[in-house]
Amino acid sequence: MVPFLEVLDGIVKRGIEVRLIHAKDPGPNWCDDFDRYPTLWTAMERMLCPRVHFKCIIVDGVRAYFGSANLTGAGMGAKSEKKRNFENGVLTDDPALVEPLVEQFDSVWRGAFCRDCGRRDFCGDPVA
């Protein structure tokens, strides 16, 4: 299995925009792995939003994966067969499913919910 950060590193090296929203700062293992891909420090945009619980990957606004898996070893199936999580997800190019995901992601990214957010105390850098 190819590490997820290695996949992202390859994507940004091809000049493709990558934006990632975290609910909280990643743990030490993820940070150690992230340090192995210095291109990601400047080429990938990241933001924190403590209210984000959705897990989705959107490609060019026309294809999306959404599901239950966190971007962790257990969530992505990297753990042993007896330890990995049971997950599910959908990969689609149906505009009726993709467009609302794009709208939700972009709304959070732009800070549309920041001003009235009840969790601002947990947000390190509110967008608005």
Predicted feature descriptions by range:
Residues 1-128:
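PLD/PLD-like phosphodiesterase catalytic module centered on the HKD motif
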